[in-house]
Amino acid sequence: MNRSKGSSSRRTFLRLAALLLPAGALLGSLQGVRAAARPRKLYLAGPDVFRADAVAHGEALKALCARYGFEGLYPLDNALPKQLAEPREQAAWIYRANIGLIERADAVLANLNFFRGAEPDSGTAFEVGYATALGKPVYGYVDDAGSYAERIRRHAPELIGEDPTRDRDGMTLEEFGLPLNLMLAVPATLVVGDAEQALRQLASRRHG
């Protein structure tokens, strides 16, 4: 008797569920959540925009993204309006355009190699922070392994003081075994290698 009542209750529940939730809707929504969690559009951050071949390099990066199933969004995709002649206006327009690309992207792929010193490009660092604040995944790549302090000693020995744990101004070299300052290294997934190696890892997680 109890088994019969239980079976009847289950049938009633299933009929109600069928009325309230169209067939396949739950599966579709779950697949949508999974798809949203797998980045498709990547903002390509880095000091590469300062290269002599910046446009060609950006096209190569976007082609590389496409090879791994992503759409690359490169800062120089934005064409500066010709009517903006004043440098400050141009700078403000570029800032807003880059912010717009980050907001459109599902994730950020960042070149975090040292640039003009023993730190990544400051603009790229800001973009990483902005993307992190938006809850977007960040994948960064650096050419060489080692801790932040080790990499500074290797790339910029002229900055090191008599005490190898401090720079020439007496400031402590950060040493947590991370390749960059912790405020970049903790939120980002860092890959030792180039953009393709970072994309390969990102793609493997996407399809995993």
At which residue positions do the language-model features occur?
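N-terminal secretory signal peptides that target proteins for export/translocation
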Residues: 1-3
